[in-house]
């Protein structure tokens, strides 16, 4: 029974570790201050649909 427990814990650890690492690279743009949702003081542009009605996209 203890062996089964260890196998389950090991499997969960191995499966969750790569998915956590992979998500870090995809979130870089979302963490960047200069992404589409960031309100730029210089030009007032925003290309995200949530703020598009208040700001021009400029593309």
From Swiss-Prot:
Residues 1-16 form the signal peptide. The modification Cysteine amide is found at residue 57. Residues 17-42 form a propeptide. Expressed by the venom duct. It is found in: Secreted. It comes from the Eukaryota. It holds the Pfam family Toxin_8. Keywords: Acetylcholine receptor inhibiting toxin, Amidation, Cleavage on pair of basic residues, Disulfide bond, Ion channel impairing toxin, Neurotoxin, Postsynaptic neurotoxin, Secreted, Signal, Toxin. Disulfide bonds join 46-51, 47-57. One of its GO terms (molecular function) is toxin activity. One of its GO terms (cellular component) is host cell postsynaptic membrane. Alpha-conotoxins act on postsynaptic membranes, they bind to the nicotinic acetylcholine receptors (nAChR) and thus inhibit them. This toxin blocks the rat muscle nAChRs alpha-1-beta-1-gamma-delta (CHRNA1-CHRNB1-CHRNG-CHRND) (IC(50)=5.7 nM) and the rat neuronal nAChR alpha-3-beta-2/CHRNA3-CHRNB2 (IC(50)=2060 nM). In vivo, intramuscular injection into zebrafish produces rapid flaccid paralysis. The cysteine framework is I (CC-C-C). Alpha3/5 pattern. Negative results: does not show effect on neuronal nAChR alpha-4-beta-2/CHRNA4-CHRNB2 and alpha-7/CHRNA7 (when tested at 10 uM). Belongs to the conotoxin A superfamily. This is Alpha-conotoxin CIA. It comes from Conus catus.
